[in-house]
UniProtKB/Swiss-Prot annotation:
The protein, known as: NH(3)-dependent NAD(+) synthetase
Subunit structure: Homodimer.
The gene coding this protein: nadE
Cited PANTHER family: GLUTAMINE-DEPENDENT NAD(+) SYNTHETASE, NH 3 /GLUTAMINE-DEPENDENT NAD + SYNTHETASE
Pathway: Cofactor biosynthesis; NAD(+) biosynthesis; NAD(+) from deamido-NAD(+) (ammonia route): step 1/1
GO cellular component terms, semicolon-separated: cytoplasm
UniProt organism field: Methanocaldococcus jannaschii (strain ATCC 43067 / DSM 2661 / JAL-1 / JCM 10045 / NBRC 100440) (Methanococcus jannaschii)
Length: 259
C-alpha cells in the first residue's frame, strides 16, 4: 500500500487537503483540465469527493490533432461525476501564434509547439479560475515532477496539486480503487501534445522502472546501490538521476541575485 496506508486513508488525506486549501483561499471550488487521461481523471474524482460535484468545473481543451478518444474519455469522466464541463478548442489560438502544423509555412516543432499547447491550456484554466473564483487543481504526479515531465508555466502551473505526492504507478492503483473507467486506466499514458505521443516513449523508460528508481532515490540511495538492489542497468539509473538534476529549475522559483 502507499506509504503503508490503506487506499481509504490516502483518499481521506487528499480530500481533506483539497477542502482545506479551498476554504483557506475562500474560493468557490476548483477547475480541472480534463485530458481524458488517468491523472486528470483521478484528480477530478478526488475533487468531487472532497467538494461535491457543484464545486468542480471541468475544462476540455482539444485541438485539431487531439485523439477523439481522449475527448470522449474526458467527457465520460465529467458526465460520470455529474460536473459542469466546458469544451474550449484551442486550434484557432495555435493558428494565431503561427504554430507549426497549424499554418502552411511552418513545420511542427515538438518542443516549442508542444509546450505552447500546454501554456495556452494553462491560460484558459486560469481565466475560468479568475472568472468563477476557483483554484486550479493541477494534475501532475510525483514521477513527472521529479523528472521534469511537464511544461514550465504550462501544465505544471496550478494552485494545488492533489496527486503530487503519488508516483504514477500509485496513481494507477488509486484510479482502480476510486472507480475511474477501465479504458482510461489501461490506455498508454500520453500528454497529448502531438499525434501518437506517449509518455513512456518520450521519457524512454517504463513507469514501473522509473518509479522503482525514484522511490529508492528518495531514500538517499546512490545509483550503484539502486543497481545492486534492483538489477536495473546502471545506465538507466544514471539517466533518471540526470533528469532529476537537469529539471530542478521546474521545481523551484526562478533564481534571483542577492543584493
Amino acid at each position: 500500500m502507499l506509504w503503508g496506508e490503506s487506499m481509504e486513508e490516502i483518499v481521506n488525506k487528499i480530500t481533506k487537503f483539497i477542502r482545506e486549501k479551498v476554504e483557506e483561499a475562500n474560493a468557490n471550488g476548483v477547475v480541472v483540465g480534463l485530458s481524458g487521461g488517468i491523472d486528470s481523471s483521478v484528480t477530478a474524482y478526488l475533487c468531487v469527493k472532497a467538494l461535491g460535484k457543484d464545486k468542480v468545473l471541468g475544462l476540455i481543451m482539444p485541438e485539431k490533432n487531439t485523439n477523439p478518444k481522449d475527448v470522449e474519455h474526458a467527457k465520460m469522466v465529467a458526465e460520470n461525476l455529474g460536473i459542469k464541463y466546458i469544451i474550449s478548442d484551442i486550434t484557432d489560438i495555435l493558428k494565431a501564434f503561427g504554430a507549426g502544423g497549424y499554418v502552411p509555412t511552418r513545420e511542427f516543432d515538438k518542443i516549442a509547439d508542444g509546450n505552447l499547447k500546454a501554456r495556452i491550456r494553462m491560460c484558459i484554466l486560469y481565466y475560468f479560475a479568475n472568472k468563477y473564483n476557483l483554484l486550479v487543481a493541477g494534475t501532475s504526479n510525483k514521477s513527472e515532477i521529479y523528472v521534469g515531465y511537464g511544461t514550465k508555466h504550462g501544465d505544471i502551473a496550478c494552485d494545488i496539486r492533489p496527486i503530487g505526492n503519488l508516483f504514477k504507478t500509485e496513481v494507477k492503483k488509486l484510479a482502480k480503487y476510486i472507480g475511474v473507467p477501465k479504458e482510461i486506466i489501461e490506455k498508454p499514458p500520453s500528454a497529448g501534445l502531438w499525434e501518437g505521443q506517449t509518455d513512456e516513449e518520450e521519457l524512454d523508460i517504463k513507469y514501473e522502472t522509473l518509479d522503482t528508481i525514484l522511490k529508492l532515490y528518495e531514500k538517499g540511495k546512490t545509483p550503484e546501490e539502486i543497481h545492486k538492489e534492483t538489477n536495473i542497468p546502471l545506465e538507466t539509473i544514471n539517466y533518471v538521476f540526470d533528469l532529476i538534476k537537469k529539471n530542478e529549475h521546474k521545481r523551484t522559483l526562478p533564481p534571483t541575485p542577492e543584493i
